[in-house]
């Protein structure tokens, strides 16, 4: 009876079906043996009451679903002709623990042969389509998408057979799609989002779009960055320390060499001072050859070496602020004068206007503050290094004093004769082919100019320049005030004490004049003597 009721509900006439009404059609007498036949039904009650013929025609054929269409295709063996694309590598299941073998447990048939061949291509792991197959029957769930829609053009080499060198290519990729085992049914515990490198081999040089997440090869190491606690400026600081230590070693070696060369020059006459002797070249200490030099050449070379060492020990003249101007615009007013403006209820044009100070005073204070900040930030010279520097400077001054004293004595000795004898202090000197061997006065003038300029630069670097007695240019004097490495007061005091012990005529002259009266006054006297003999 239930079956007959189903037939009543499903065998509606055309009129009731068009009006979407319930159609009740009882069975004809003797038609119980064939309940599925629509012709065995009587006209429905609604058509009988309306007096219209009750007609029941066959409905149009229903469209097949995608699952039914695919089932029909697989039944006639058309699955092999579909343009399937590789979805999962063949070796993906072999690297998973517990997967058994790399080969699939499903026997190869004509229906799944194309899928097994296409799955052997190595590529980027995308979301594969789970296949639930038993034997040769292929069944797909209604919720699953068809294989044709799931296939994507991700293989850059076409649909042909993949190259064999890509099967073992390492691929460090973050799997954003789960891995499914072909031997086990699909389950949630089969999802694997771990990073799993493939076995051995080098990265391919082509097909880079397959390895979108490749970082580094196993044979390559990423560039090492700064570790925890390591500063980016450690290397620069280490280089500065190495340069400073090298300058200190050179300074110590120069001090001992100056003592060896100029310790006994006070009692030596001028011909012996001007005589050449083999001496080690200080500008190229690595060379084993010796070059002939006299005392003048050694003093000039030692002065150049000493000046080079002072440049290495000098502080870095980088400004502490990013502004390149001498004074800041914010120095022209005071912040305290703007505070009462907002608190006053009445406006006062006299009191509310800030009083600008003198710009020259502010620039001077700003420059003094910058110099103090620079001196505070620069590394200081310790007392042993200061004494070593002043010792080298004293040896050089003593050598210059000895040389020019002997030259001045030779000039004074020749004043009694009609033709004064001027010693050739720079023999073999030529300027553009012009020989100075017969012009001894020009040789002495050149030596004075060169020695005075060298002493000015050294004293400027030390910070002990006497501006009144110095012949240095204005730019050198300004540079000496800004780039000195020693404290001017303490260095001048030590030098004055050293020179007062050796020069009795300058003991009554306090200050820097005692130090300048020994060498520079002799240079002035020599120039005056040369002017008289012209």
Swiss-Prot record:
Whereabouts does the entry annotate DNA binding, in residue ranges?
13-54
Kindly list the GO CC terms recorded for this protein.
nucleus
Q: Where is the composition biased (Basic and acidic residues)?
A: 130-146
Q: Which domain of life is it from?
A: Eukaryota
Matching Gene3D superfamilies: Zn(2)-C6 fungal-type DNA-binding domain
- The UniProt annotation puts the region (Disordered) at 88-170, 350-378
Q: Write out the entry's keywords from A to Z.
A: DNA-binding, Metal-binding, Nucleus, Transcription, Transcription regulation, Zinc
User: Which Gene Ontology terms cover its molecular function?
Assistant: DNA binding; DNA-binding transcription factor activity, RNA polymerase II-specific; zinc ion binding
Q: Which InterPro entries match?
A: Zn2-C6_fun-type_DNA-bd_sf (IPR036864), Zn2Cys6_DnaBD (IPR001138)
Q: Please note every region of biased composition (Polar residues).
A: 109-125
Q: What role does this protein play?
A: Transcription factor involved in regulation of gene cluster that mediates the biosynthesis of the mycotoxins cytochalasins E and K.
Q: What is this protein called?
A: Cytochalasin cluster regulator ccsR
Q: Which organism is it from?
A: Aspergillus clavatus (strain ATCC 1007 / CBS 513.65 / DSM 816 / NCTC 3887 / NRRL 1 / QM 1276 / 107)
